[in-house]
């Protein structure tokens, strides 16, 4: 980032960064903003080659000229979240089950729309089936801090059955923290359907 490439340099840059360093990019959200398309992506891969230590999000600001990309600007999207919650969001967007589970305290509880899970193993089973298994991603649209944690409003999409649901689905994630771990996660619809 902070570099400019033109013409054939673009292909060399893209090949070396995205192919040469084993980088994975997962689209999370697309919107029109200030006259151009903004594609938010989660980025994961060879951290040493990328010069980072964990997954991160980028906003790709795309200006089109007809059916071609005239300009692409990449802006790192920083989420102001406590470390365990940020780690959970990043892991969820990469379908990384072990990393998601590691963010929870051993005696944590989770409640996903009136379904209760107690302890890491029960939470792991839920996350394996319904989050990583259904390739669910979340695009954070609002962050509200509360005593003991944070509430996150997010647009959620994935390979789950969307019958009767909006797409993307908006959910609220209420995280309660204990030290550097998630002690409780409650997931509810942002509004009734």
Mark where each language-model region is:
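Short, well-ordered alpha-helical segments enriched in acidic and aromatic residues
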Residues: 1, 8, 94-107, 111
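Surface-exposed, charged secondary-structure patches
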Residues: 10-52, 57, 61, 125-165
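An amphipathic alpha-helix signature
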Residues: 11, 97-101, 120, 124
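Hydrophobic/anchoring residues in structured secondary elements
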Residues: 30-32, 74, 110, 143-145, ...
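Short beta-strand segments enriched in hydrophobic/aromatic residues
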Residues: 43-45, 76, 104, 156-158, ...
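Short beta-strand edge/turn micro-motifs at domain boundaries
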Residues: 57-79, 170-193
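Short, aromatic-enriched amphipathic alpha-helices that serve as compact interaction elements
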Residues: 78-95, 103
